[in-house]
């Protein structure tokens, strides 16, 4: 009787820990990428091999998109596609030293006590290029968006 209780409690704990640990995984690589997405990526970046993730975006998280993360010209980069292969954006990490002087001056003037955590060059599907600079203010990640010329556009709480 004691052995069966011990066995049952062990099985319960094992099952519970397995189920619980699966909920801790935030994002798993996507293996079922639609053919139009793979084809569009291969055409644009023929020598790169991405790791794919799927996510829902949009105002009410209603748009399924596919993000491919890869190295391009020695930069961590990613692309975001709709399921039909339509390119939404290309994002490339940039070093703080590569940001336009106007952006650095703005950040030093307005947010000198908040160090830049990361920066990216974003090209949207309409070929509009922006810089996104991430900082942490009061434990909240804030993205400052700038034009290609370095003019401040908006802040995004992310």
Model regions and ranges:
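Bacterial Sec-dependent N-terminal signal peptides
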Residues: 1-27, 41
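Interaction-mediating elements
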Residues: 23-158
